Amino acid sequence: MKNNVKRLLALILALAMSLSLFACGQKQDGKQDDVQADTTRVFTDSCGREVTVPADVQKVAVSGPLAQMVVFAIAPDKMVGVANAWDETAQAYFDEEYLSLPLLGQLYGGKGELNLETLLAAAPDVVIDVGEPKGSLAEDMDALQEQTGIPFVHIDAYLATMDETYAMLGDLLAMPNEAQGLADYCRAMYDRVKAIADSVDKANILYITGDEGLNVIAQGSYHAEVIDMLANNLAVVDEPSSKGTGNEVDMEQILNWNPAVVIFAPGSIYSTVADNENWQTIPAIRDGRYYEVPMGPYNWMGFPPSVQRILGMQWMAKVLYPDAADYDMYETTQTYFQLFYHCDLTAEQYAALTAHSLAAD
């Protein structure tokens, strides 16, 4: 992580030097730029950093996929690019203007690091990082901000406090009304599902990932927030992984855990377990209590663990405790898609999304 940021800073410095040579030739006829100072204000981010930002932010870049999802809900028209290319499933839901946004890359993790030339060419008013703070985050933000001249801010995002995340975004972007609607929704849906979780005998479950089905999302990890709230997560390990792939285990351990319900991540082995002798001995598989997480336009349970988990937790509550979760899942999904993806979900699209994801009536 540290090496990645250091490499970025070196690239920024080299690029900035080349740009400064070009700028020298422009100053003679650019005096009007000196007399038109932008109106700014100070924004305090979740790291406690006081960052000078434009009072009227119009162009936003995101540092990674978590921020991409969160910011898209409130200000899609302010985004100058995306951290990751949209998943193919997004094409059915998003307008072309959003699908064709430039690819900026991401600051932490992932396959593609931040594309500095594209970022600087996009000239954002601010770069927004959203999620769980990394150990060196404040220092990284300060260094990148100093080298690029672009404000970098971090806003914490946790499942239980997504309303606070949107309140801070609303302040930063001067969009209080839009932020309030999203914040109120996140608060109400979290509280609804938390009330369900507090009222039931929790099911013993495993969340399985990986193309061989030998990875689990362990209790206590950032990725397990929904699972740990709604169920008795049997995957207890010494060092829960912070990665979306989870912790690798063996089949013997899965058999020993003996889950009553199994949730499979998209792209895992959901479609083959019914014919696998080892898996057939597990109560969840034998009794037909196994499900695949809906995928579209993102994995509803996270990975990356962003705001879409607000929808995922409502889905998981419906799967595990249908009597307590006495809401219509199609209407619930429609509302989420309208608020966060700015699209109307058809009954046919919903049926395709949840084909392997709901208990049979």
Describe the residue ranges of each PLM region:
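Bacterial N-terminal signal peptides that target proteins for export
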Residues: 1-12
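C-terminal motif of bacterial Sec signal peptides marking the signal peptidase cleavage site
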Residues: 19-23
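Bacterial signal peptide processing site
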Residues: 25-27
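Short helix-initiation/N-cap motifs at beta->coil->alpha
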Residues: 46-48, 102-117, 240-251
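Extracytoplasmic substrate-binding proteins
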Residues: 50-52, 139-215, 237, 294-358
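Structural recognition of the beta-strand scaffold that forms the well-ordered cores
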Residues: 61-63, 80-83, 103, 126-130, ...
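A short, structured surface patch at a secondary-structure boundary
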Residues: 67-122, 126-133, 232-235
